[in-house]
Amino acid sequence: MIRVRAVVYPGASFPEYQTLGSSGADLRAFLPGGPLEVHPLGRVLVPTGVCVELPVGLEMQIRPRSGLALEYGVTVLNSPGTIDADYRGEIRVLLVNLGLAAFVVSHGDRIAQAVISSVLRVEYVRSGSISLTERGKGGYGSTGVL
């Protein structure tokens, strides 16, 4: 098992897996000063009170929690958010409310999940052309919508 060093502010919650098979560890809101209200179509940057030291070659992806999306229309706006191995600041989660009613985020609420992933770096090489494929330049919807 890979160990990731974490600094957790007093009163904040350590990232935690809910089940043995969970791929994402829940991140909780760190709001000791009181709750935040997210209006419909509004967005808010929610602190977690957690800083991590990821080994080079790993990243942390900040992903939505399915229950928040289903029940309230609340999701992570820049999903997945990326925490790079050289970032040492507090993890903050950009939530957006796509629902019809205001949503309140309170201290300790589970707001996102953190998934650790390997990073493969490549060298981009300038070229005058790239190989042709059957798909070609077909983009959004080119292979069918449903």
From Swiss-Prot:
A biological-process GO annotation: dUMP biosynthetic process
Catalytically driven reaction(s): dUTP + H2O = dUMP + diphosphate + H(+)
E.C. code: 3.6.1.23
Pathway where it operates: Pyrimidine metabolism; dUMP biosynthesis; dUMP from dCTP (dUTP route): step 2/2
Residues forming coiled coils: none
InterPro entries membership: dUTPase, dUTPase-like, dUTPase-like_sf, dUTPase_trimeric
The protein's name: Deoxyuridine 5'-triphosphate nucleotidohydrolase
